[in-house]
Structure formats: C-alpha cells, structure tokens
Amino acid sequence: MAKQVVFDREAREALEKGITKLTEAVRVTLGPRGRNVVLEKKFGAPTITNDGVTIAKEVELEDPLENVGALLVREVASKTNDVAGDGTTTACVLAQAIVREGMKNVAAGANPMFMKRGIEKAVAAVVENLKAQARPVETKDSISQVASISANDPQIGALVADAMEKVGKDGVITVEESKGMETAVDVVEGMQFDRGYISPYMVTDNERMEAVLEEPYILITDKKITAVADLVPVLERVVRTGKPLLIICEDMEGEALATLVVNKIRGTFTCVAVKAPAFGDRRKAMLQDIAILTGGQVITEEAGLKLENTTLDMLGQARQVRVGKEETTIVEGRGKEEAIEARIAQIRREYEESTSDYDREKLQERLAKLAGGVAVIKVGAATETEMKEKKMRIEDALAATRAAVEEGIVPGGGTALVRAQTALDGVQAQGDELTGVRLVYRALEEPMRQIAANAGVDGSVVVEKVRQSGDSMGFNAATREYVNLFEAGIVDPLKVTRSALENAASIASLVLTTESLIADIPEEEPPVPGGGMPPM
C-alpha cells in the first residue's frame, strides 16, 4: 500500500488535530459534574460511559494523519490505565495541554529537543513535590472517599471500602454482574478452588447438594488413585479418630472410588474426594499452598513419599471444609502461622519479579487465598446498559483504591498539580529548556480548569483562588465551594496523579520532536458488482 509522507509544521499540526479531537471527546467526563459519552456498537445496545480509556479506545478518525495523533493519546490513556487503573481522562487532558502550548513555541522557533529536556526536568520536580504532599491511606473512611471520587458515587465508595475491609489489602476483589437490582458484596471466607466432589454420592446435605466436613483430616497428593490398597493404611488411621477425611488428588476412579462411596452410603465413614486445582506447575504450587494452610504435606513421589506410608501427622486439618458440585472451600486451616507468613512472602516476591500479567493475576489470587480472602461485588441495575456502566465505574474505583493504599493520597480536584507548580521555581533551566519547564507549569492547571468548566465555573478564577488559599484548600466542583479537601474527602491516589503526568509528558514530548509523519493513503473501495452472470 502506498504511503503519504508529510513534514515539519504540517506533520505536527495533523498530530495536534488528532490529539485535540480525541481529548475533546474525553474531557467532558472529568470531575463530579462531568457528562457521559455514548459509544455506538456494531451489535447490541450502545455503551454509556465516563471512563476515559474506554472512550479513547473507540475513537478512530477518518484522516489517517490525524488518526496517528489520536492513537498516541490512546496510548497515554491505556498506559495510565495499566499502571494505575484510573486517571485516564486527566492524562489525556495533560497531554493535550503540553502539546497545544508546545506547538506554539515550536512554530515560533524553539528547539524541540531542548524543550523535551525541560519537560523531563519539570516532571521529575513535580513528582517529588506530589510525593511530599501525599498522606497514607489507613482508615476505612479514607478508602471509601477515594472510591467515591473515582466512581462519582458514595454508594459505590462504601461498597468498595466494605469489600477491602473484609479481605484486606492482599485480598482479591472481583466484579460480576448480578441477576437482580441490588448491588452487594459477597465474601468467600477461607481458601476456595474451582473443583467439586468427584462423585455426587459423597454429599452430606442432599437438599443443597454439598458435603460439609467438620474438623476433617485432609490428604493432599498429586497422584491418581485407583487401587484401594494405597488408601487402606491411611483410612484405617483416620477411622480410628472418628473424623471425616477430604482427599485432594489428581483423580480417583475404579475400586478406590467405589470403596469410598459404599462406605459413605452405609454410614461407616465420611470421605470426600476432589480433583486437584489448576494444571502443571501451577497445580504443584497450589497443592503446596493448601498443605501449608492446613499444616499437612503434599504426598508426592518426587519428595519420596508414598500413599501407603502416610501417617496422621502428614495430613492437613481445618475447622470446616465445604465441597459443592464445582468448588471446594477450606475454612480456618490449622497450618502454622509462621509457615503461612513465609509462603505469603515468597509469593509476594514472585509477584514483584513476574513480568507476565496473567502470571501476576494468578499469583495475586494465590496470595489472596492464603492472606485475606476473596470478595465478589455483584452489580445490579435495571437495564444491561446501566449495569455495564456501573460495573466500569466500580472497576475504576477498585483500581484507584488499590493505588491509594499503595502510594497514598493527595488533594483531589486537580489541586495537587496546581500546588506542585511551586516546585518548578527551583528547576535549573535556561533558554528552550526553560520553555519546556513553562509548558509543564501551564499544563498543571489544565485538569482543574476542565473540572471547573464542566461545573459551569470559570477555570482561571478557580485556579487563582486555589493558588492563593491554604495547602489543603481546594475547589469542590460538586457544591461549587472552596473547602478543605482532605476533610471533605476529595482526594486522588498519588499513583494515579503521578502516572497521568508522567505518561502525558512522555507522549507530548515525542509529538513536539516529530519532524515527519508517514501514514497509509486510504484506498477507495471498488463499487460492489451487480447481481447476475458475469460477462462472457
């Protein structure tokens, strides 16, 4: 396909137009009085959202040169979303502000490479200032405030804070669609994995079709059990104690399964067998997690252990085990606290060193099962469109809350960025480098200006008033009043604000240093031929 090549001012102007078009679509959503954007779908109902990255991903411009600019801002939004999970609209607004002011200076003859260095120096100074402004998040109220601001809904804030309190900062919180109208939090206590009983004859509660074992012994092995002779020694030892037995194994069939089922039906002995969770190396790791949680050992020939030689002290124990058709939950494992803590520390190290998103997600799940638990927020709404919009806001709120717990919070409403302007006074720069610093200085006001504009107030007036007021004072766009932002609960996670600025400055610097642009020449679609026979 043939390419078109444009240079100099024409290239930069095309990029700026694309950036502006995408940012104009996104910026209307910023702040508590921000509006929604409707996204048309090829199939099904349209999506209504105020999530910056979701809107950015939908924008594709007709002009291929302008579309390159839009793609660059989309990259800003996506990167910020990946790192912090929120702040995507702020990132787009900051990027556009730096590009807009920078283009004027490049057109006036400023050197873009020196401006880029100035931008980098300014961003480093601002980030240090933001860190100094940050406060740690320690209370449930603080978590609720962060989530409420992100989702623009106090009810969602309370839900997220409730879920966080129940499972702890290492817990996993997932968001699912509910079948009803209510939005609620369900917490799974203990360790749960997605494997149920091997045979339905093993259930102890026929009405609910689940097996509930009180104070059971737990046999954990990676072996497939078919011969009953392998199990007899350990079964005899467990029967003497009068306690039930849970067997976690690769699979069970043949006479071993038949023997357990017959004994259960006769009422001689209660034993439930479930398949081991996951596959391959992840299965070995999860079996080891279960063993440490319950104070047992994994009976594996790799470690020189055989089923027929298993003793009671090799078995795990728990207060209760519930086994359903598709999941097993171990409640209050009897493992040693120090062993569990050591395992948690090991998984956390693996999580920090892992580069794969999938592996990190699975490690986070394992960490939650050992450390905290799993909470599920079930989202209810009157229509599917409303449910999807609400689900997106809850996911954003969750990401913002995790970011806040990680790095702390700063004053919200764009105030932290305006306060950070003072850090730029001490940046050592001259000439075009100083111009780059000034670009960032002006851009730091842009989120507050936009929040004020969306609330129907003059942005310049708001910025000036905030600049002259005390450290924690800022503009509450919801009530159009000037308040102490920490006391009013108007806060942003430091990680979100920092990531938005860093990613915006990175892309904006590259746009300003662009001197040529290469894009596809759109091909005209040939007309569709008419029906009938082709010509002879």
Curated annotation (Swiss-Prot):
This is Chaperonin GroEL 2. It is an enzyme of class 5 (isomerase). It comes from the Bacteria. The keyword Cytoplasm applies. HAMAP family: CH60. Belongs to the chaperonin (HSP60) family. Together with its co-chaperonin GroES, plays an essential role in assisting protein folding. The GroEL-GroES system forms a nano-cage that allows encapsulation of the non-native substrate proteins and provides a physical environment optimized to promote and accelerate protein folding. The gene is groEL2.
